Regions:
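Formylglycine-dependent sulfatase
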Residues: 1-168
């Protein structure tokens, strides 16, 4: 299940369906779709998604407003826990890298937590913590990385990271 774009690939992976069977619009997952999060949770696994969501409401206000808020909410995707970027509206997504806007288990992380930090590090640390907390139980982790495409921004290992001001 792979497509030339990240969103159709992620929906295929999570639903097990080809895109002609699950497509309702770009950046949207049908709110009635059952994901592997549901299946794993129903079968006794502790489940986590940590990384990119971007499947609830992709369109900006001035671009196809009729498709806003039609996708699946992260809270309804079948996972016990989540730590995701772009959980809701496009205009609220901010940077996915430096100073990211991250929605974790029903609350946005505060700037005190995210300021100066790198999104992938926050996601990875949450995954490691989840695995430690659930090491005695069967668990399932889905890590849809945000690093797969543009915008290309400095990483914590680059000299430019300290002075880089990401879009908000």
């Amino acid at each position: 299940h792979a497509q030339p774009l990240c969103t159709p690939t992620r929906i295929q992976l999570m639903t097990g369906k080809y895109n002609f069977r699950n497509y309702i619009g770009f950046g949207l997952m049908d709110p009635n779709e059952k994901t592997f999060g549901h299946i794993m949770t129903d079968n006794g696994y502790k489940t986590l998604i940590s990384g990119k969501w971007q499947l609830y409401s992709y369109n900006p206000l001035d671009e196809m407003p009729e498709d806003r808020n039609k996708g699946q909410k992260i809270e309804d995707a079948g996972f016990d826990e989540f730590c995701v970027w772009h959980a809701h509206q496009t205009e609220e997504k901010g940077s996915r890298y430096k100073n990211p806007i991250i929605y974790q288990n029903g609350e946005y992380l505060t700037k005190e937590i995210t300021e100066g930090n790198y999104g992938e590090d926050i996601f990875s640390e949450y995954i490691l913590d989840f695995m430690d907390r659930n090491s005695d139980d069967p668990f399932f982790v889905y890590f849809p990385m945000t690093l797969t495409h543009r915008p290309l921004e400095p990483t914590p290992d680059s000299e430019e990271f300290a002075i880089f001001d990401p879009p908000s």
